[in-house]
């Protein structure tokens, strides 16, 4: 996997709530995320300021789970982001101060533009290589309204796969499924 030189040490918003430190292993398979070159993502969901769930997932596990999602759902999600996010303009704007403030990437929903402090729930997601966060389309934040839009696009098959994954990983019923994008 290619990545740019735009990276910084894993910032605190992506540290584990449980340990107060960066994630060290994949929440699915247990692989070492600090191994040089290890690619992974971190997703955290919040209800206001409270962490609802969090996980770190190696790229192999992500690819395996993504392969279980319906092609129709994946296409609808891609179309949704193409229609609602100007990724190039977002990256230009955010790269201006990426190294000074990771929070600038995470304080507003990348789709709706809402300030996350004004939402009931939100999720943040980042891409990482060993001890570093990569700035590309990641990191990003999604408000509850954007998540609701995305969930409506998912097929029953995809919702089932994501709910199975959520139940396996967290052993709880979530109001919205884990969105592995």
Predicted regions span which residues?
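Domain-exit/linker segments immediately C-terminal to small folded modules
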Residues: 91-111, 115-117, 127-129, 150-152, ...
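Short recognition patches in nucleic-acid-associated and regulatory proteins
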Residues: 20-52, 72, 103-137
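Short metal-binding segments enriched for Cys and/or His
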Residues: 52-78, 134-162
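Short amphipathic alpha-helical linker/capping segments at the junctions of internal repeats
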Residues: 45-50, 74-87, 130-132, 158-172
């Amino acid at each position: 996997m290619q990545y740019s030189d735009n990276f910084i040490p894993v910032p605190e918003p992506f540290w584990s709530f449980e340990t107060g430190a960066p994630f060290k292993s994949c929440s699915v398979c247990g692989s070492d995320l600090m191994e040089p070159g290890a690619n992974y993502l971190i997703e955290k969901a919040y209800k206001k300021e409270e962490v609802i769930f969090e996980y770190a997932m190696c790229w192999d596990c992500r690819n395996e789970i993504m392969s279980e999602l319906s092609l129709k759902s994946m296409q609808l999600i891609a179309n949704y982001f193409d229609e609602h996010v100007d990724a190039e303009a977002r990256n230009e704007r955010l790269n201006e101060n990426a190294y000074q403030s990771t929070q600038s990437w995470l304080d507003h929903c990348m789709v709706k533009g809402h300030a996350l402090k004004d939402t009931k729930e939100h999720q943040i997601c980042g891409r990482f290589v060993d001890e570093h966060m990569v700035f590309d389309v990641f990191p990003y934040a999604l408000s509850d309204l954007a998540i609701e839009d995305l969930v409506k696009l998912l097929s029953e098959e995809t919702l089932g796969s994501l709910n199975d994954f959520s139940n396996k990983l967290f052993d709880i019923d979530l109001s919205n499924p884990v969105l592995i994008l």
